[in-house]
């Protein structure tokens, strides 16, 4: 059923308003940036006033995944599996230098060079570790992106979520993923 163009814009506005002011957050904290995430959720910064509900019970109840800290190759399948368990529309914030690009460990044999190599990222928050205000700024940027989205088909609001169905794994297929073998350091 197609919605008439006259009704499309108000419906899109109401849906996006509800999505952007009721984000349930699933924090995937891997290092010191996770401490800053906890500080942001406390009363001094209180991101619940922005409509962000911290500490969802799990990925199946979350709209937003915040990946904070160093992403190792062994942790990569777990991140992918948890992302796949989130319902559409789903959003990701990469929080801190380590999750953005590997941080100070970028040259390590066991570090993934950014979480965006595993899952699509909506907002990058730089810093080592970023201040709580930086995460609040990133959340505001994400809310602006959500407000500008088109009304999705079948619950999917981001076009890139369905762009590559070959990358979508069946529910338990991510369990069979293994970490790449340990590479010895380059002698040169």
Swiss-Prot record:
It is a peripheral membrane protein. Residues 157-177 have a biased composition (Low complexity). Pfam families: Oxidored_q6. Binds 1 [4Fe-4S] cluster. Its cofactor is [4Fe-4S] cluster. GO terms for molecular function: 4 iron, 4 sulfur cluster binding; iron ion binding; NADH dehydrogenase (ubiquinone) activity; NADH:ubiquinone reductase (non-electrogenic) activity; quinone binding. It is an enzyme of class 7 (translocase). Signal peptide: none annotated. One of its GO terms (biological process) is electron transport coupled proton transport. InterPro entries: NADH_UbQ_OxRdtase-like_20kDa (IPR006137), NADH_UQ_OxRdtase_20Kd_su (IPR006138). It is found in: Cell membrane. [4Fe-4S] cluster binds at residues 32-33, 98, 128. Residues 153-188 are annotated as: Disordered. SUPFAM superfamilies: HydA/Nqo6-like. It comes from the Bacteria. Keywords: 4Fe-4S, Cell membrane, Iron, Iron-sulfur, Membrane, Metal-binding, NAD, Quinone, Translocase, Transport. It catalyses: a quinone + NADH + 5 H(+)(in) = a quinol + NAD(+) + 4 H(+)(out). GO terms for cellular component: plasma membrane; respiratory chain complex I. Its EC number is 7.1.1.-. PANTHER family: NADH DEHYDROGENASE, NADH-QUINONE OXIDOREDUCTASE SUBUNIT B 2. NDH-1 is composed of 14 different subunits. Subunits NuoB, C, D, E, F, and G constitute the peripheral sector of the complex. Belongs to the complex I 20 kDa subunit family. NDH-1 shuttles electrons from NADH, via FMN and iron-sulfur (Fe-S) centers, to quinones in the respiratory chain. The immediate electron acceptor for the enzyme in this species is believed to be a menaquinone. Couples the redox reaction to proton translocation (for every two electrons transferred, four hydrogen ions are translocated across the cytoplasmic membrane), and thus conserves the redox energy in a proton gradient. This is NADH-quinone oxidoreductase subunit B 1. It comes from Salinispora tropica (strain ATCC BAA-916 / DSM 44818 / JCM 13857 / NBRC 105044 / CNB-440).
